[in-house]
Amino acid sequence: MPNSLVYKKGIDLKKAPILMYGYGSYGSIIDASFRKTMLPLLNRGFIFCISHIRGGSEMGRQWYEDGKMFKKKNTFYDFIDSTKGLIQENIGDPKNIFALGGSAGGLLMGAIINYEPELYKGIISAVPFVDVLTTMSDESI
């Protein structure tokens, strides 16, 4: 699974907490660009990981197609596999993994915490898109 990692030079990668970020929707490409909002976490020894999961189009059109509609579960499984892949590579403390996603990434957070509740120590689901039927039926938005 393609990931982008950033961390402070000199940290012990095996013992560092991880903040996983995922979106995986609408073909959006999540660039691995500098985010000053991550500095407080990085200065505290965190690893920040952007997981480039299906539903985004980082790997092309088919990558996007394979993460939408009836294939949406691929997005969720990709994120979980991305997390487990880091653990297998001895990157990060497996007891201190957190996940972050907003809007459609909030839907992702809801899914992963239901599929693998023991894998993540905490979840941040910012403005989650989790009540699809009500949201899509609301004519005011």
Please annotate each region the language model reported.
Residues 106-118:
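Short glycine-enriched nucleophile-adjacent loop
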Residues 101-109, 123:
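Gly/Ala-rich beta-loop-alpha elbow adjacent to hydrolase catalytic centers
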Residues 1-98, 102-103, 115, 130-131, ...:
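Cap/lid segment of the alpha/beta-hydrolase catalytic domain
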